[in-house]
Amino acid sequence: MGFLEDKKRTLMNLELAIREGLVDEEIIPILNKINEIDNYYTTSSCIGRVGIMEIPKDKNPKLYSRWLGKWHHYASYDELFNALKNKKEGYIVFVMNSPILHIACKDIESAKKMLELAIHSGLKASSIKSISDKRVIVEILTTYKVDTPIGEDGEIFVDNNYLKFLLDYSNSKLKRAREILMRWANRLDELKK
């Protein structure tokens, strides 16, 4: 199966995921813009998120971590404190993840153009993730990230003022990361030339 067949199949799956509400609404216009360009299609995406995660100490964190709360919008204090009521065991970590997209590029030249546009738009952590005979995968990402331990085994070690500060700080970083993503998205037509 070649690039065009992969693109067609992937876009059919994307349409299904959109209909099922599995794709962040705010990122759909960007996905559509990328997918309209011949040499590119998106394989995964997230508009960014803020959350509280409980990470086990002695189990595989990829399998056994759980979200106490996860928000793709700018979270509120009430959401934060309600999520913390569910804490039980393990490390309690406050996280903010930047928007992220994975884009399949037809060839290395297309990948290079996508990567240059991303980096010059401020998406400095963007990189080539994989290269195969069929496609090159480029990851689009900012450098903004928060990953802060705030407690352990059901006990929070910081006060509510610090938690509010951390949420405000993370919401502002997420907002800035989304602004950078939009600056890049507004330049995507340059790849049609």
UniProtKB/Swiss-Prot annotation:
Catalysis: reaction(s): 4-demethyl-7-[(3S)-3-amino-3-carboxypropyl]wyosine(37) in tRNA(Phe) + S-adenosyl-L-methionine = 7-[(3S)-3-amino-3-carboxypropyl]wyosine(37) in tRNA(Phe) + S-adenosyl-L-homocysteine + H(+)
Q: Which Pfam families match?
A: TYW3
Enzyme superclass (EC): transferase
Stated EC number for the protein is 2.1.1.282
Key word Methyltransferase present in the record?
yes
Checking InterPro entries in the record gives:
Taw3 (IPR022908), tRNA_yW-synthesising (IPR003827), tRNA_yW-synthesising-like_sf (IPR036602)
Q: Name one GO biological process term.
A: tRNA methylation
Q: Which UniProt keywords apply?
A: Methyltransferase, S-adenosyl-L-methionine, Transferase, tRNA processing
Q: What molecular function does GO assign, one term?
A: tRNA methyltransferase activity
Under the cellular component aspect of Gene Ontology, which terms does the record hold?
Answer: cytoplasm
HAMAP family linked: TYW3_archaea (MF_00266)
Function recorded in the entry: S-adenosyl-L-methionine-dependent methyltransferase that acts as a component of the wyosine derivatives biosynthesis pathway.
Can you tell me which family this protein belongs to?
Answer: Belongs to the TYW3 family.
Q: What is this protein called?
A: tRNA(Phe) 7-((3-amino-3-carboxypropyl)-4-demethylwyosine(37)-N(4))-methyltransferase
Organism lineage: Archaea, Methanobacteriati, Methanobacteriota, Methanomada group, Methanococci
